[in-house]
Amino acid sequence: ENRNFRECFALQRAIRHNGANAEVWGLNHDNYSEEPDWQSYDLIINLENYDETGWVPSLSKVQTKKFLWSIDAHCRGIDVYTQTANEGNYDLILEATPEFLTENSIWFPNCYEDVLIKPLDIDPIHDVGFCGNVVNRGQILQTVAQNFNFKFDNFVIGDAMVEAVNSYKIHFNANISLDINYGNFETMGCETLLLTSYNKHYEKLGLKDGENCLVYSSIEELIEKGNMALGDKELRNRIAKNGYDIVKEKHTFKQRAKTVLDILNGIYDEQSI
């Protein structure tokens, strides 16, 4: 139910959308039994963030350009990614968390798959919802539930996730640690109003409090802004539409794939993010 939403297939579709070809290979894929001819590619992108069995082959002697996509350094720390990059002689780390940038990495923010995640023709029936994993959000989710008509969709994935987010007037989000998680972009990609915890890098991504999302820095602010948006449908819809427009323009897998191809072709502009 979540297969088509995985990063590997989302990036593959996006690369093809940008006019290049892409193949997916790895553990639990149908083609895993036959290792590719790595030298036959222009670029290899390693998306594995949790190689617990050591299945990823050593690419240290492969001369093809190699990128490592670091998505979860905010959870695991940067050392494991740096070690993988060094041992495999990777050319570049695509780093989702800007606090971990080095001279061998670029900021590669999270994004969303606009082919699968989009506004649906349904009326939102829940004032505030949360679709995702609890992790360390238990206490704040309890607070939200105590203050709003709240719908909790625990680990709902795939098409059901898209339907859930579309059913909320407001989608509550709490980033973990330094992360700007996928949920930010997925929510806005559904044209649902995002109410999210503060991150200092939002402005660089074009996410602006009160214009295309709502950002809180305290419980009091969370409740105040949630009630404000619920009490003003026109405001809520306007902010949600602005949010949809900004992520559709700047933060889809298609844009991230273009960045990868621009780097490969030597025409990357850091200001494009």
Region spans (language model):
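N-terminal soluble segments of membrane proteins
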Residues: 209, 226-227
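Conserved acidic donor-binding segment of nucleotide-sugar-dependent glycosyltransferases
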Residues: 213-219, 228-233
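Conserved short-loop catalytic and cofactor-binding motifs
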Residues: 175, 210, 244, 248
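A charged, aromatic-enriched C-terminal amphipathic alpha-helix characteristic of glycosyltransferases
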Residues: 231-264
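Nucleotide-sugar donor-binding catalytic core of glycosyltransferases
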Residues: 1-209, 215, 254, 258, ...
